[in-house]
């Protein structure tokens, strides 16, 4: 078996359900255990899923918890962390958030835009300037802090966040990045701008890594991997009619995911991207913080991922991970 990287993208509560369905399908149909990935990259919801995998929870148990099925001893951590109920959040209304006044950019943001225009992303900058959210995501991760006891998993887990002062992406857990408590890295990666409050770590504050990219798959370039599996719940399958801000967001996420996948392939790495089709998107809806359809999302993504993985052109790429 070659060296496999796993990228778990952003997507809120529905994104975690999508991860569970896709990963359970890979485990069931191919016999591949996502916990064995050489490196796991998690952004926002993906940082939670990645942490659970690195903590020993198998994909089948992620799905079982999501659909309220009985858990094995390996899945007991899910119940310890979250109980048996899906988390409940206020509805996420992107249009309403964008109507709130923006903050003025600080000197670090301006300096970066002037001195490094090739790496400056206007959309990312705009996300950092959104009015601060009021919900403290750290409250939702108290149990994670107690379970992980401040220690990072032994196997590589890279968690992506964005530094609010200058819009720069930070990859916690990657060699060369300052050590931080795991629960704070996850919290910062999940701090959806305008919805959750930014997370302070040391002298800096951070927001959701999805502000830079919904997947951040590009961080695995030049890592010597043979295959990268990307699970991108926020992506649209391709160009289509953009009716509203939700369609625009999916189109933007899909464009970034395709661009990152192309760059990885150009570097000699095979890439397989799982993204929701139209039927899955209909089940997921527009409020990615809603738990109303979690069970349906897991079931739909499980079936769709299995069908996609069975396509000859995809099956040939995944042959190295199947038993």
Language-model region placement:
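Patatin-like phospholipase
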Residues: 1-43, 48-323
């Amino acid at each position: 078996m070659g060296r496999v990287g796993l990228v778990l993208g952003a997507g809120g509560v529905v994104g975690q359900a999508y991860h569970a369905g896709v990963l359970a399908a890979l485990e069931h149909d191919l016999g591949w255990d996502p916990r064995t990935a050489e490196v796991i990259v998690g952004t926002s919801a993906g940082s939670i899923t990645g942490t659970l995998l690195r903590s020993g929870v198998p994909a089948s148990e992620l799905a079982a918890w999501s659909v309220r099925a009985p858990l094995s001893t390996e899945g007991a951590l899910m119940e310890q962390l979250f109980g048996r109920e899906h988390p409940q959040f206020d509805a996420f209304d992107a249009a309403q958030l964008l109507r709130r006044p923006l903050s003025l950019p600080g000197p670090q943001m301006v300096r970066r835009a002037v001195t490094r225009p090739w790496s400056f992303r206007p959309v990312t900058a705009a996300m950092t300037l959104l009015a601060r959210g009021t919900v403290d995501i750290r409250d939702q991760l108290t149990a994670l802090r107690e379970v992980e006891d401040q220690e990072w998993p032994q196997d590589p887990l890279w968690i992506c966040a964005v530094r609010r002062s200058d819009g720069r992406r930070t990859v916690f857990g990657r060699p060369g990045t300052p050590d931080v408590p795991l629960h704070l890295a996850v919290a910062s990666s999940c701090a959806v701008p305008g919805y959750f409050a930014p997370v302070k770590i040391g002298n800096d504050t951070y927001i959701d890594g999805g502000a830079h990219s919904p997947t951040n798959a590009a961080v695995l370039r030049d890592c010597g991997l043979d295959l990268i599996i990307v699970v991108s719940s926020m992506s649209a399958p391709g160009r289509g009619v953009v009716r509203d801000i939700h369609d625009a967001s999916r189109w933007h996420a899909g464009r970034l995911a395709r661009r990152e996948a192309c760059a990885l392939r150009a570097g000699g790495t095979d890439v397989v991207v799982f993204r929701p089709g139209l039927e899955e998107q209909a089940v997921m809806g527009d409020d990615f913080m809603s738990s109303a359809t979690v069970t349906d999302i897991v079931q739909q993504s499980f079936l769709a991922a299995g069908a996609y993985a069975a396509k000859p052109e995809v099956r040939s790429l995944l042959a190295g991970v199947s038993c």
